[in-house]
Design a protein with these regions (language model features):
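Active-site donor/metal-binding and catalytic loop motifs
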Residues: 191-228
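Conserved donor NDP-sugar-binding/catalytic core segment of glycosyltransferases
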Residues: 94, 98-129
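Non-catalytic, C-terminal membrane-associated alpha-helical segments of glycosyltransferases
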Residues: 219-222, 236-290
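Short aromatic/hydrophobic "clamp" motif used to bind/position activated sugar donors
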Residues: 86
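A recurrent flexible, glycine/aromatic-enriched loop bordering the glycosyltransferase active site
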Residues: 140-160, 176
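Glycine-rich, basic loop-to-helix element that forms the pyrophosphate-binding segment
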Residues: 64-81
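Acidic donor-binding loop at a coil-to-helix junction in glycosyltransferase catalytic cores
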Residues: 176-184
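Acidic donor-binding segment of Leloir-type glycosyltransferases
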Residues: 20-63
């Protein structure tokens, strides 16, 4: 049996589930299921829309009133699932490959963890999230990802055996945004479980406003700071920050950020937003954390 698992928080999953249902039916799989788990969404319209998923054959919608956290909601989905293989897809992704499910079914022979990647569609040059994702697109081919299989892994689109997920669940200390997937990739390497990268992308085409992305980024940086010891070697920003600290330059950079941080943030929120300013802001924000 194949289980398709979608954690959601304030994301409308209806079109995503419809696309997956059509592919599952076309494959004539012996048994399959789609489970959508709402992690305490607050948008009433989205909740109402997602409740209609229960009317789609093969789909189940589970609503949690409280927010469990990004790691815990995925572990919850594993407990709800019945499949031998599990496909995780983020709720804000879009199916862009007509043979998406077929490719994953065929890839089951390759390994217990298979990551399909993602592509970027739409967006504008004034949107910071779009610029950020678009910049990294050239490095997202399966060939390049396989060079660093554990460091180029994300939970937005992957297949995993039930056995691996039961043996290595997501670390539920990661309640807030960021790095739960990075740490899980590290755990796979520690325990000698291979990650196979293939070209089977979903599309990332929904980009939050610059202000929301900055808030999310700051939350991720606080997560990185909290788990900095566990994530050493798995974050380029952490590597730079540690080097500055070893050279006793952290106080200087933190001081500069206190003076320039608000100005940088205003730039990032404007139509002149750019990635160089974003990288400087991220480093400065991280170094200013206690």
């Amino acid at each position: 049996m194949l289980s398709i698992l979608i954690p959601t928080y304030n994301d409308d999953c209806y079109e995503l589930v419809q696309a997956l249902t059509l592919q599952a039916k076309a494959l004539n799989l012996a048994d399959w299921e789609i489970i959508v788990a709402d992690d305490g969404s607050t948008d009433g319209q989205v909740i109402a829309r997602n409740k209609n998923l229960q009317d789609i054959p093969g789909c189940r919608f589970v609503r949690n009133n409280d927010n469990m956290g990004r790691a815990a909601i995925r572990n919850f989905l594993v407990e709800q699932a019945r499949g031998k293989y599990l496909i995780f897809i983020d709720a804000d992704m879009k199916i862009c490959e007509p043979n998406y499910l077929k490719r994953y079914v065929m890839a089951q022979a390759l390994g217990n963890v298979v990551y399909g990647g993602y592509i970027v569609q739409g967006g504008t040059k004034t949107n910071l999230r779009f610029l950020y994702e678009k910049q990294g697109e050239k490095n997202r081919s399966a060939q390049l990802r396989n060079n660093q299989p554990y460091k180029d892994f994300h939970t937005s689109n992957f297949m995993v055996s039930r056995k691996v997920m039961k043996d290595l669940p997501f670390d539920e200390r990661f309640r807030h945004y960021g790095y739960e997937d990075v740490f899980w990739g590290k755990q796979l390497e520690v325990y000698g479980e291979s990650i196979v990268h293939i070209d089977n992308p979903v599309a990332f085409c929904t980009f939050e406003q610059n202000s929301d992305f900055i808030v999310k980024t700051e939350e991720g940086l606080r997560t990185l700071r909290l788990f900095r010891n566990e994530l050493k070697g798995y974050s380029p920003l952490l590597k730079v920050a540690d080097k500055l600290e070893r050279n006793k330059l952290k106080p200087l950079f933190a001081c500069i950020f206190r003076v320039m941080g608000k100005r940088l943030k205003r730039l990032l929120l404007s139509k002149h937003t750019n990635l160089l300013a974003f990288q400087i802001y991220k480093l400065g924000y991280y170094l200013s954390l206690k």
